[in-house]
């Protein structure tokens, strides 16, 4: 079990203790630092909805360092990002692979960021098939449908032609931060918070 740091703050009412993720949430920062599971997705969705209810006109900042995970869980986060009113800016630190890369690209155009030494990876959805032949066929068809959906999302957010997306995601496709910027996955590469324009943090 991982250790979650506690932050203690002084106020007029005395000391208040927050776990680090709750403290970040006060600054409208959501941090994805694990694989994407149903449980993780539900927490992130709840945070997105909470921040929308707090202020529907203020940006939400979504920081990502994730190897990816369940496609259906990731799509639930993606749909919520598109559904809510606030702009969701995304920032990759470390890695954004598979479904996490899709979430990175899904930030609002112009506010998708990466740090200099990130690794971003795209590939087609994977699944282990077992059971009777008809069951395997059904599962294979579902994987193909998911692949088509994910490719359409990448086309929408990167501006790349679907033929290129299909070709690039056929196998693991790695990008540096600068390559991801050229590809249309992110808009800016930052080495320091000081280099972020005020408009990027609003």
From Swiss-Prot:
A Pfam family that the UniProt record links to this protein: CLP_protease
Residue numbers annotated as active site: 98, 123
InterPro entries per record: ClpP, ClpP/crotonase-like_dom_sf, ClpP/TepA, ClpP_His_AS, ClpP_Ser_AS
EC number of this enzyme: 3.4.21.92
Disulphide bonds in the chain: none
This protein's GO CC annotations: cytoplasm; endopeptidase Clp complex
Reaction(s) the record says it catalyses: Hydrolysis of proteins to small peptides in the presence of ATP and magnesium. alpha-casein is the usual test substrate. In the absence of ATP, only oligopeptides shorter than five residues are hydrolyzed (such as succinyl-Leu-Tyr-|-NHMec, and Leu-Tyr-Leu-|-Tyr-Trp, in which cleavage of the -Tyr-|-Leu- and -Tyr-|-Trp bonds also occurs)
One GO term of the biological process aspect: protein quality control for misfolded or incompletely synthesized proteins
PROSITE patterns listed in its UniProt record: CLP_PROTEASE_HIS, CLP_PROTEASE_SER
Subcellular locations according to the entry: Cytoplasm
Main location: cytoplasm
Keyword Hydrolase among record annotations: yes
GO-annotated molecular function: ATP-dependent peptidase activity; ATPase binding; serine-type endopeptidase activity
Keywords: Cytoplasm, Hydrolase, Protease, Serine protease
Keyword Glycosyltransferase: no
Family classification: Belongs to the peptidase S14 family.
Role played: Cleaves peptides in various proteins in a process that requires ATP hydrolysis. Has a chymotrypsin-like activity. Plays a major role in the degradation of misfolded proteins.
Quaternary structure note: Fourteen ClpP subunits assemble into 2 heptameric rings which stack back to back to give a disk-like structure with a central cavity, resembling the structure of eukaryotic proteasomes.
Protein name: ATP-dependent Clp protease proteolytic subunit
Taxonomic source organism: Syntrophobacter fumaroxidans (strain DSM 10017 / MPOB)
Gene: clpP
